[in-house]
């Protein structure tokens, strides 16, 4: 509750509340949380936030770094998948993002990342080498 993550209702399942619990979060809230984590401005020790950041590191393109996390809520209809994170530029600029999409079948899982990379590339934020 102290971070204000979504509706802050984690219910009783502490190991997967973000997938099957009562927790609800908007894309705007996801982006805000990702930005706060990227800038270590959440109400947690900065060293802990740095450890989480390191766990979310995906790849580097040039000097830009991509950090992200995917997820798939399968207990709702329609099922929802997301790819949320941020790009860190060498000058320290942070661009947080989230992609939420309806999930249907197997290929949708890989499409989340590719769609996000395509948009970040087109916006000139993270050039993806194909």
Where does each model-flagged region fall?
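Mid-domain, small-residue-enriched loop/turn segments at the edges of structured enzyme/sensor domains
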Residues: 1-39
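Structured C-terminal helix/loop/strand segments within mature extracytoplasmic catalytic/sensor domains
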Residues: 33-130
